[in-house]
Amino acid sequence: MKKVFITGGAGYVGAVMVPHLLEQGFEVTVLDLMIYGEHILQNHANLNAVKGDIRDQDLLKKLIPGHDVVIHLACISNDPSFEMNPDLGKSINLDAFRPLVEISKKSNIKRFFYASSSSVYGIKQEPNVHEEMELEPLTDYSIFKADCEKILAEYQSDDF
């Protein structure tokens, strides 16, 4: 059985993703601040829900080893939320990213998935935006998302 570690697993995307992974037979560990409440994730034999902060490197070093996959969803999402507290947004969306990637790599994680944002492409005239397009982020939120993509590219390999 594959073991999946998800940051932000009780958030908007994670609350939908986690039940699907559990239905598919994955063993899932969620690390989340649980700001929407701990009731978001239903009890399941293959679910370990941990209330915690991705900025806590000691906690990451304790939780990540033994998993096969990391799915990184945790962030202060969207521009308005980010702009309410830019320092908090930067600490979660950017500053915590490289340590998470490094801890994952050192823990022999086989795959690392990062949920970026289409906002990294800025405003395009083309009707279809795709990954080969130049990044043109316009706000701190999208700039930090783009920065994280670049950081992850530094660690990219066939076994990560």
Q: Residues of each region from the PLM?
A:
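Active-site helix of classical SDR
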Residues: 144-147
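N-terminal Rossmann/SDR dinucleotide-binding element
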Residues: 1-69
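NAD(P)H-binding glycine-rich loop region in Rossmannoid oxidoreductase-like domains
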Residues: 54-92
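Conserved Rossmann-fold NAD(P)-dependent oxidoreductase catalytic core, especially the SDR/UDP-sugar
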Residues: 72, 98-139, 154
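Rossmann-fold NAD(P)-dependent oxidoreductase module
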Residues: 16-20, 103, 151
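Active-site-adjacent segment of SDR/Rossmann-fold oxidoreductases
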Residues: 140, 151-160
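Conserved catalytic-core motifs of eukaryotic protein kinase domains, centered on the activation segment
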Residues: 40-42, 80-87, 123-127
